[in-house]
Amino acid sequence: MTSGEAAKAFTPAEPFRMVVEEGKIREFARATASPCAEHLASENPVTPLTFLASHRLWMIDDRHSGWHGIHRDFRYLLHGQEEFTFHGPLPVSGTVLTVRQSIERQYEKRGRRGGTMVFTDLVTRFWTESGNEGPPLVEERSVLISTEPPAAGAPAGTSEPARAPVEAVEAVEVVQVVAAPGELVFDTVQPALTITDFVKYQGASGDFNPIHHDTAFAQSSGKPGPFAVGMLAAAVAANQLTAVAGDVPVHRYRVRWSEIAWPGDALRYQGVRTGATSYRIDVTRPDGRNHLTAWADTTG
């Protein structure tokens, strides 16, 4: 058991039905700047690699959330890591999925800058018509970090706690991949981020945390203003990988965040082939600081 981990059992949420709809696929693809024709096809579009992060749109109420009965303050909730593992082909429009979410563990750790961070490992599993028995088609694992409010007397609206997610990933013993020199497979710079981009992604994914679009709410957390949804750049990176990998299925896609991305940042996406079936993607801000790193393993 990890130091500070609470010996607590969590009850899985009730399963719910998710019908993959072609209009939602295209909306998600547009919100994440997908260059892939299969995501925008007029018939049976294929879901983008991170599309299933939108599952919360199909939840009826709190009983379908792994968080049911657990308080969380969205002003101080950070996304440390995300991982998708695929055990079959990506769903196409019309696919009916059974989805069930659960918290596997929750524990505390002292941050390097002081204060207590609470880590939550949230797992969402997706099955096809077989229901929620047997191996899932897709498994999504999220590491969420709840941090403490800024110290009393700290000036509001000025902080940028850029390194907290990195501390979080180290704390849960995620091994950072060190890639050997390899082939650069894409190197692009996207247009400067806007709050409109954040809102489009929030609508497409169902992540409605107001910290990404509401200035007053963001400043109440100690931030200077709204900032990018972490999964936005993760989805853009995944789409660029799909455009390069073509028809080769991805088995695992993992992301960890290092720095917040802000309105006005024109993010640079660099994808490197690190092995016969593996890739690393670095997403950097205009100042050269890393926003996120993603790793992908394909099946061939």
Region annotations inferred by a language model:
Residues 1-81, 153-155, 165-247:
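Hot-dog-fold acyl-thioester-processing enzymes
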Residues 225-228, 232-267, 272-274, 283-286:
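Catalytic-pocket segment enriched in acidic/His residues
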Residues 1-3, 81, 85-190, 257-300:
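HotDog/MaoC-like acyl-thioester-processing domains
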